[in-house]
Regions:
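Active-site cofactor/cluster-binding pocket
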Residues: 1-171
Length: 171
C-alpha cells in the first residue's frame, strides 16, 4: 500500500499518485525484501525507514544493490522506531499502526526542508499541528489529542541520521 503526503504552503487542488518525490517514508521494516522503495526518489532526497536497530547496524541490513543507489543518488538516509513509539502510547494494535504513521509525520518534518524553506519555526509548526489534531481528534477527548501530539513529537525528535557505509560492508 502506498500513502502520499503532499505538503505545501498553499492548498493543493490536485489529487493523484506521485511518481517523483522528495521524500519516502517507509513504515515496513522488510521493504527491501520485496520491492525497491527508492524508485522515484529524487537525487538528494530523504528516505526514512522503520527500524529499531542501532545506527551502527542499519547499513548492514540494506542489500548491496540498494546501498549503491543510496550512495549514487546522495539520498539522505534516516531510521525511526515508529512502531516502538506508537506502542508506548497505545495498547491497541489497530491504533499502533495509525500512530506509527503519525510518528513518521514528525520525522518527515524534522528531516525535510519544508519548515526551513517556508520560514516556519518549531513553535509555529507545533501550534499548527496541535490545531489540526484538535479538529481531528478533539471530539475523542484531550488525552487523544495529547497522545497523538506526543507521538508526532517523538517522531520529530527520535529520527536518526544514518551515514552511508561501504557497498561491500557485511550484510
Amino acid at each position: 500500500t502506498n500513502y502520499f503526503l503532499v505538503a505545501a504552503r498553499d492548498r493543493i487542488r490536485v489529487n493523484c499518485d506521485l511518481k517523483h518525490v522528495d521524500a519516502v517514508l517507509c513504515c515496513d521494516p522488510k521493504i527491501f525484501t520485496h520491492t525497491n522503495p527508492l524508485v522515484g526518489l529524487k537525487d538528494g532526497g530523504v528516505f526514512i525507514w522503520e527500524s529499531n536497530l542501532k545506527a551502527e547496524h542499519v547499513w548492514q541490513r540494506i542489500p548491496k544493490r540498494f546501498r549503491q543507489e543510496l550512495i549514487d543518488k546522495k539520498i539522505k538516509f534516516y531510521t525511526l522506531a515508529g512502531f516502538d513509539i506508537a506502542k508506548k502510547h497505545t495498547p491497541s494494535p489497530e491504533l499502533q499502526t495509525r500512530m506509527q504513521g503519525n510518528s513518521f509525520l514528525g520525522a518527515f518534518f524534522k528531516t525535510s526542508v519544508f519548515l526551513d524553506d517556508h520560514g516556519i519555526n518549531q513553535a509555529t509548526f507545533l501550534d499548527a499541528v496541535l490545531t489540526q489534531y484538535k479538529k481531528k481528534f478533539g471530539k475523542l477527548g484531550q488525552s487523544v489529542v495529547d497522545s497523538n501530539l506526543e507521538v508526532m513529537k517523538s517522531g520529530f525528535e527520535d529520527v536518526i541520521n544514518i551515514s552511508h557505509g561501504n557497498i561491500d560492508d557485511v550484510d
